[in-house]
Structures are given as structure tokens and as C-alpha cells.
């Protein structure tokens, strides 16, 4: 697929940068981040401004346009994809590589003296603004809020903002009512002497009110803001969806609730004006709590003396620690998901040798099998179905122009997941339908060793995820190999497939200590550009574990795999595994056979059951 031609769009954007209708004085650079007004990773079509301007549609990236240059910063997941999707107007800035300048350093190096750099304050996170403004100011430049989004001005056929119906979740799924969640939040606010809390992240609002939506594809969220006071609840949401009988009943809107649980509903776009009015009535010592990831427009509406900024909100942390109802729901969801994947892999083994299966048809088949499971709602992200060289594109999504046929000669990687009412799944398996080469087996085995090292790890309570990242890379590092993405991310409970604040990574989502009840992925990989990609991913639950000793009474933790899908033994160089690694894999496969076998039997899926039994035969080293 040829890259998008962007010359005319860039000309129009540069013209807008000088247009007095939009800016009081011309700006010399314009920043276009990935996110929306809620700093979401996955966004609605109406918010895909960076993709519209550049052609690059990966989930992470920041574009900066000056009079002379157009540059795109993205991370290692997207280097290959961005290079393919952008035309020659663009310079790709590969984040994480030592020779790549930061965005602010690059701007300082290319801008004329005393330049003005513009950005839409509603879609830029506060922490990003502060960092950028500080560096620019020290070099004699200025970061300017441009309230009219300049991309919107040149995007003539921009889609409408979605406003789809809401889904209510009962206690069987959530384990705790929305009123109790609000009460818990108010306790956290009182501990910090905070009167008000502004909620801007879409998944936090969905979690708090036990509601789900479908405004963003694959992410069960809805466009909204909330302001929680010690005695007030304000919800900012558009459309008549709040008037649906099930939603009114769920939120108790028609009942004469005690005042502190009565929800005041406001239009979505009135958040800044209502927040401004609220702040105007604050007494001198009253504080308003807001995430430093909230937009600059929201945080700047709160006067500095009243503003309390924190990296992670109490909702973010509470949401990450799943209660027993959520953990059980996630277990159920992963059992259903494993059934669908056993069906898929059995089907692929029969059909691939016939030569008619493509990356797209395999992805479609995976969705078809998932849709047969109870409480299926949607996929949790676009399926990464990739064979041969396409597997080396870490976040590859097949399109007709790139769609390869699966064969007996190439490694096949499928990274996929689903949203069920009781949980969110995300699983990657890499397999070969013919005979893998010795090098493919070698690389796969290094990745498997890393996967096992993380999954079997026992670590003290309070350990941060970044300390486990090297466990996953050690076998690869020993051979001079590595991968350019984190090892794991948090996973929501029928919410976003990527969630903070926990994870296993050398960078993102690794700041908060892991604690029992958190759910993360374990997904090391290896990618040979132009040849193949390998990744093995399970979703795992952090659980307590008893150890021989208990230093300082702090306790220990380990991981329970929730994903129960066989790992193809054909791809393993078994003699390179230790006895402990062989035991781990055999025990894992025994659990897959026991748990998923029962469900396959219950659903009458005999062929898939036979496939499961074949794929979970124990391995042993040739001594």
C-alpha cells in the first residue's frame, strides 16, 4: 500500500499556522499528539488527527510541523509501520534510539529565534505541556495554546463524535456498586484534604459508574467527564443515552437519593465552563484533585493555588487491583477465549496446507469463533495476524494490499483478544505449519525462556514491574538479541486492553509496585526484519505465594496465568530448556488440558478437544 500523499495537507496546515482567524500571531511550529481530550491510547475516528495529516495510523506517535519540516516521533513497535505509511515529506524520529533527539531538543535546533510553538490545549497532557514549555522557554521560544484545532480546520470530511448507547454492569460483574466506589473515592479525597476530584480518563469514568459504552472501537468506553465532590456528583455526557430506562435505573436518577449520591447531568462540552464556575466559588484552602495526564486545558482551568496534580489517580490504582468478582470474571473470559483459539488453531492446521488461508481470513475466523462464546461483546483490539516478514511489524494489521497467504514455509504470529462482559483478553501465539528452521526454533526458545522466567518469578511485595523486565530479555541478551517493546502492560476488566499504572517494562506502566489482584501481560518477543516475528503472550494475575522465609514480613508474589492456550512445542529446541523450564511448560499444558478440555467437552467441540490433547503432550529432553 503506497504512503499517503501529504503535500497539500501540509501546505494547508502551514497556511492555518499563519491565519489570524485561528492564531493571534503566526506560529512557527504546530504539535499534533496521538490522543484525544482524554489522553486515550485508542481513539475515535474523529480524533485521528495525526493519522489524517501524516498517513501513519499506529496508536502512539507525535507529529510536529514547522515551516520547513514535518517530523514524526514513535516507538519501536511502529518503526517499520511508520516508515511504510509516511511519504517523503516526513522524517521518522525513532524514539528510544540514542541518536534520536527529543521533540523539544529538535524544536530548539530547527526553530528561528523567539519562535511560537502551538498546540491544542484540550488534547495535550499537562505533564507533556510543562516539560515542553520549560525547555522551549529556556531557549527563548514560547509554547502557545491554540484553542481552534488547526487540523480540524483543514479536515473537511471529519467524522462526527460517536454517542452510542450505554451498557450497565451489575454486581455479579463488578463486585462493588458505583455508590460504594464513590464513597471509597471520597475517603481517599478526605485523606488528602481535597474537596473535588476531576475525572477525565474514559476508562476511569466507565469503571467508577459501572457503565460501559462503544464510542471508541474495541474499547468499552463513552465520551464523558465527571467531577466528584464530597457531597456532589457531576457527569458530563451528551445525547439521550443517559435517559435509557436501564441507565436511569442503574444510576438511580429517578429516585430521591440522598444529595451526595444524586447525579447532576451536564452537556459533555460544558466541562470547562462548569469547572471554571466551580473554582470561582472555592474558599482559599479548598483543593481540586486532577491527574497530571489530564489535558492542559482542564488543569489550567483550576487556579494554581487550588490545583492538586498527581501522576496516578485513586481510581486508576483501585481499577488496577481486581476484586474477587473481577478476577473470577477474567478467569471465565480466558476460558472462553481459549476455547475459541483451540477451534481456530485446529482449523488452521487443517486449512493452511490447502493454500487458501490469508492473514485476513485467519483473523476473521478467530473473530467468528470468539463470537460463538457467551457474553462476547467485541474484539479488544484489531487482530494482529501476520505471516513471514509481516510478523516483524510489531503492531501489524493486515489490509488487502499487504495480505499474505499462510504457508508451510513461514512463521505465523497472531496477537488477538476479545471483550466479554466478564473480562478482557489479549493473547499471542506463534506457530509454524510446516517445519521451522533451526534459527526460528532457536529464537522461539529464547523468547519462551524469557516468558517462563517472568511467569515463574517469585518477588517481594512492593516490587516494581521494570525490575522484572530483564527476566524476559536475559536469554535473548545472552545471544545478542532483544526486542523494542515492553514486556507487559496492565489489562482492564471488560475495559481497555492497555491500562496503567502497572506493567512489566523498562519504561511505560512500570512506576507502580505490583500487588495482588493486578493483571498484566507477559509478552517477550523477537523480530527479524524482513523474515519473521515471534511473540508469546499470556495474561497473568498477580497472586500471593508462600516462601520458605519471609524477610521483614513483607510477603512474596508470583503470577497465575489466566491465558490457557497451548504453546506450540514444534517451535521449541527442547534440549536448550532447563529441567525447571520443561517442568513449567508441562505443568502449564496440563492445566490447559484439564481446564480448557472440560469446557471444550461441555460445549461439544470434539475436534478442538482432540487438537488440545495433541498439543499438550509432555516434552522431555534427550539426555
Curated annotation (Swiss-Prot):
The superkingdom listed in its UniProt entry is Eukaryota
Q: What is its EC number?
A: 3.4.11.9
Name the GO terms of the biological process aspect. bradykinin catabolic process; negative regulation of programmed cell death; proteolysis
Give residue numbers for the modification (N6-acetyllysine).
304
This entry carries the following GO cellular component terms, namely:
cytoplasm; cytosol; extracellular exosome
Localization, UniProt? Cytoplasm, Cytosol
| Activity dependence on pH, as recorded | Optimum pH is 8.2.
Instruction: Enumerate the residues binding a peptide.
Output: 77, 395, 489, 498, 523
Details of cofactor binding? Binds 2 manganese ions per subunit.
Claim: Hydrolase is one of the keywords in the record: yes
Tell me which residues bind Mn(2+) 2.
426, 489, 523, 537
Where along this sequence does the record place binding of Mn(2+) 1? 415, 426, 537
Gene Ontology terms, MF aspect: aminopeptidase activity; manganese ion binding; metalloaminopeptidase activity; protein homodimerization activity
Which tissues express it?
Expressed in all tissues tested, including pancreas, heart, muscle, kidney, liver, lung and brain. Highest levels in pancreas.
Question: Is Acetylation one of the keywords UniProt gives this record?
Answer: yes
User: How does this chain assemble?
Assistant: Homodimer.
Q: What does this protein do?
A: Metalloaminopeptidase that catalyzes the removal of a penultimate prolyl residue from the N-termini of peptides, such as Arg-Pro-Pro. Contributes to the degradation of bradykinin.
What family is it from? Belongs to the peptidase M24B family.
Could you identify this protein by its name?
Answer: Xaa-Pro aminopeptidase 1
Source gene?
Answer: XPNPEP1
Amino acid at each position: 500500500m503506497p504512503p499517503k500523499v501529504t503535500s497539500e495537507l501540509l501546505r494547508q496546515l502551514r497556511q492555518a499556522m499563519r491565519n489570524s482567524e485561528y492564531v493571534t500571531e503566526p506560529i512557527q511550529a504546530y504539535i499534533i499528539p496521538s490522543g484525544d481530550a482524554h489522553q486515550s491510547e485508542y481513539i475515535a475516528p474523529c480524533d485521528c488527527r495525526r493519522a489524517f495529516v501524516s498517513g501513519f495510523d499506529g496508536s502512539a506517535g507525535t507529529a510536529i510541523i514547522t515551516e520547513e519540516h514535518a517530523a514524526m516521533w514513535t516507538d519501536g513497535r511502529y518503526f517499520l509501520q511508520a516508515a511504510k505509511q509516511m511519504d517523503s515529506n516526513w522524517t521518522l524520529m525513532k524514539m528510544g534510539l540514542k541518536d534520536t533527539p527529543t521533540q523539544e531538543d529538535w524544536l530548539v535546533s530547527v526553530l528561528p529565534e523567539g519562535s511560537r510553538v502551538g498546540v491544542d490545549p484540550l488534547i495535550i497532557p499537562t505533564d507533556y505541556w510543562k516539560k515542553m514549555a520549560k525547555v522551549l522557554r529556556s531557549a527563548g521560544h514560547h509554547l502557545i495554546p491554540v484553542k481552534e484545532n488547526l487540523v480540524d480546520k483543514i479536515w473537511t470530511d471529519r467524522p462526527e463524535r460517536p454517542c452510542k448507547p450505554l451498557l450497565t454492569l451489575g454486581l455479579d460483574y463488578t463486585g462493588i456498586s458505583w455508590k460504594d466506589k464513590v464513597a471509597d473515592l471520597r475517603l481517599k479525597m478526605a485523606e488528602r484534604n481535597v474537596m473535588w476530584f476531576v475525572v477525565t480518563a474514559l476508562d476511569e469514568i466507565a469503571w467508577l459508574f459501572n457503565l460501559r459504552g462503544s464510542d471508541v472501537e474495541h474499547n468499552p468506553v463513552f465520551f464523558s467527564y465527571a467531577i466528584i465532590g464530597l457531597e456532589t456528583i457531576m457527569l458530563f455526557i451528551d445525547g439521550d443515552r443517559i435517559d435509557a430506562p436501564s441507565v436511569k435505573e442503574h444510576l438511580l436518577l429517578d429516585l430521591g437519593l440522598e444529595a451526595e449520591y444524586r447525579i447532576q447531568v451536564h452537556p459533555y462540552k460544558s466541562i470547562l465552563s462548569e469547572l471554571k464556575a466551580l473554582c470561582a466559588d472555592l474558599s482559599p484552602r479548598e483543593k481540586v484533585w486532577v491527574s497530571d495526564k489530564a489535558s492542559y486545558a482542564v488543569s489550567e482551568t483550576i487556579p494554581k493555588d487550588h490545583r492538586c496534580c498527581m501522576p496516578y489517580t485513586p481510581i486508576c490504582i483501585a481499577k488496577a487491583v481486581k476484586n474477587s468478582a473481577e478476577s473470577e470474571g477474567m478467569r471465565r473470559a480466558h476460558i472462553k477465549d481459549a476455547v475459541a483459539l483451540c477451534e481456530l488453531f485446529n482449523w488452521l492446521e487443517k486449512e493452511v496446507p490447502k493454500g487458501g488461508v490469508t492473514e485476513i481470513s485467519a483473523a476473521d475466523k478467530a473473530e467468528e469463533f470468539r463470537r460463538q462464546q457467551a457474553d462476547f461483546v467485541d474484539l479488544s483490539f484489531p487482530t494482529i495476524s501476520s505471516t513471514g516478514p509481516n510478523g516483524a511489524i510489531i503492531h501489524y494489521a493486515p489490509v488487502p494490499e499487504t495480505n499474505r497467504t499462510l504457508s508451510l514455509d513461514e512463521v505465523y504470529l497472531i496477537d488477538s483478544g476479545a471483550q466479554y462482559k466478564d473480562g478482557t483478553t489479549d493473547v499471542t501465539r506463534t506457530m509454524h505449519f510446516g517445519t521451522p528452521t533451526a534459527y526460528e526454533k532457536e529464537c522461539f526458545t529464547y523468547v519462551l525462556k524469557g516468558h517462563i522466567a517472568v511467569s515463574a518469578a517469585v518477588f517481594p511485595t512492593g516490587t516494581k514491574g521494570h525490575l522484572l523486565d530483564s527476566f524476559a530479555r536475559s536469554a535473548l541478551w545472552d545471544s545478542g538479541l532483544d526486542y523494542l517493546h515492553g514486556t507487559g502492560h496492565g489489562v482492564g476488566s471488560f475495559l481497555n486492553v492497555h491500562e496503567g499504572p502497572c506493567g512489566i517494562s523498562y519504561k511505560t506502566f512500570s512506576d507502580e509496585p505490583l500487588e495482588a489482584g493486578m493483571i498484566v501481560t507477559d509478552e517477550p518477543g523477537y523480530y527479524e526484519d524482513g523474515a519473521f516475528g515471534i511473540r508469546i503472550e499470556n495474561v497473568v494475575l498477580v497472586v500471593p505465594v508462600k516462601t520458605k522465609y519471609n524477610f521483614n514480613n513483607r510477603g512474596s508474589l508470583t503470577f497465575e496465568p489466566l491465558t490457557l492456550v497451548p504453546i506450540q512445542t514444534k517451535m521449541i529446541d527442547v534440549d536448550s530448556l532447563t529441567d525447571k523450564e520443561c517442568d513449567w511448560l508441562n505443568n502449564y499444558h496440563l492445566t490447559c488440558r484439564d481446564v480448557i478440555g472440560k469446557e471444550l467437552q461441555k460445549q461439544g467441540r470434539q475436534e478442538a478437544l482432540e487438537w488440545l490433547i495433541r498439543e499438550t503432550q509432555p516434552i522431555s529432553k534427550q539426555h
